[in-house]
Amino acid sequence: MKLTDVDFAVEASGMVRAFNQAGVLDVSDVHVAQRLCALAGESDERVALAVAVAVRALRAGSVCVDLLSIARVAGHDDLPWPDPADWLAAVRASPLLADPPVLHLYDDRLLYLDRYWREEEQVCADLLALLTSRRPAGVPDLRRLFPTGFDEQRRAAEIALSQGVTVLTGGPGTGKTTTVARLLALVAEQAELAGEPRPRIALAAPTGKAAARLAEAVRREMAKLDATDRARLGDLHAVTLHRLLGAKPGARFRQDRQNRLPHNVIVVDETSMVSLTLMARLAEAVRPGARLILVGDADQLASVEAGAVLADLVDGFSVRDDALVAQLRTSHRFGKVIGTLAEAIRAGDGDAVLGLLRSGEERIEFVDDEDPAPRLRAVLVPHALRLREAALLGASDVALATLDEHRLLCAHRDGPTGVLHWNRRVQAWLAEETGQPPWTPWYAGRPLLVTANDYGLRVYNGDTGVVLAGPTGLRAVISGASGPLDVATGRLGDVETMHAMTIHKSQGSQVDEVTVLMPQEDSRLLTRELLYTAVTRAKRKVRVVGSEASVRAAIARRAVRASGLRMRLQSTGCG
């Protein structure tokens, strides 16, 4: 336990102190709870504990806390958890729920801080309003672009053409982008048949890498269309959601409820990465009558920030009579064995997963050595040397392509299976091979990961790149949403070395070969969604490094985030 935690626990009292000392609550949880209770004149320690666990839930990705199940979920049976009925009664009676409320209860069990209550309520209301704001229109001939053999995609397009908000979900290789490109051609045809102007279309994704992949995939599919369809669509580009909404440092987005987006059709890819807060900003900026198409894989990891919006939308819309979810299930892209592995993970079949990992298939490798370092070195060092060779030649296209040949993915940043440890280890191995000091901060061939948005440079959190040698010194080339960006290394502030990266950061990208470094089986981050996300980053080969116990632990554990959005969407109202 950190010294600061112990010091703060001395100042805390009652239940909050006990939970802080047990490691369930950290300093920030306790501080917020004490501050809010003091301002409201709330003296009941059960309410203080409720506030603290609500703040804790946000750190874990939930937008609220379920007071009826938190004791079981938190896994500390030895702590003095309040009786659930008494706990809820104390919260209901708290001045923190008075007007103006600091806390809210939904379904008499889910406790929210005010901001997230309002955002969830707003997302529900805005999406349902968009759902019903489009007037019925004629549907073009779907079989023209979705002939026999494209039945799932044709049904998805039919759904999207008939409603204002569409959730299009499916795993990798199921044809989501193919469906989107051809759907957009039909949307343009639909407008033409109705005598309307050509629709203004926006393509967006949460990260620059995801936006670049979306743009590339849509362009590739558009090239297969006839000249009339291509002319209807015009030249489509993809941007990050932050750029679409007009992000301004230290201020709200430029596009909001008072200044709506001008587009008739907005497509968002990798929606599983979108937090509740970002979805609230997007939904309020979409003008009435526009068509919103949310694309993603609901079985992947949810956003780094609070919320599991895509999964909630799938579950919430699925039971409504006025909203259909477009689901694609048949994979066309993967080598059969990787797709089968991903499906076994998604289904939670641990025996099938381990059977595939040990099958000896060329596209799948399982490394369960007690010390995997020698086998990892044989993979990581040759890749790093190929990257260095391209970088020394200043060959930006070759370097970026080489970068995407392989990724080492970790669940954690810290610890023996974490990103920081393996970045240092690969740099040390490189130093042995090249003689370059491992502490050199900038060097040709250094793989880069952007960790914060820089709107001036147009580089965004999650973008990747490489440091290149040039006639005037080192430069960085970043794989941005609109193509490669050449940037002076001195202008890049928030970047880190990317010989390894977290699985969360890998979302929105795919590479030829992936090595997944599993943490110990007791890791809190180890979930089915984590392993599924990691495996589905691979196009050609996946290598899983870890024990059988860690694989089984991942398969058995689901990433569950508390939220009321699903229930709100299923009910008659959002409040």
From Swiss-Prot:
Gene3D superfamilies in the record: P-loop containing nucleotide triphosphate hydrolases, RecBCD complex, subunit RecD, N-terminal domain
The enzyme's E.C. designation: 5.6.2.3
Disulphide linkage map: none
Catalyzed reactions: Couples ATP hydrolysis with the unwinding of duplex DNA at the replication fork by translocating in the 5'-3' direction. This creates two antiparallel DNA single strands (ssDNA). The leading ssDNA polymer is the template for DNA polymerase III holoenzyme which synthesizes a continuous strand; ATP + H2O = ADP + phosphate + H(+)
InterPro entries xref list: Coronavir_polyprotein_1ab (IPR050534), P-loop_NTPase (IPR027417), RecD (IPR006344), RecD_N (IPR049550), RecD_N_sf (IPR041851), UvrD-like_helicase_C (IPR027785)
Family in the record: Belongs to the RecD family.
One GO CC term, this protein: cytosol
Record note on quaternary structure: Heterotrimer of RecB, RecC and RecD. All subunits contribute to DNA-binding.
Name under which the protein is recorded: RecBCD enzyme subunit RecD
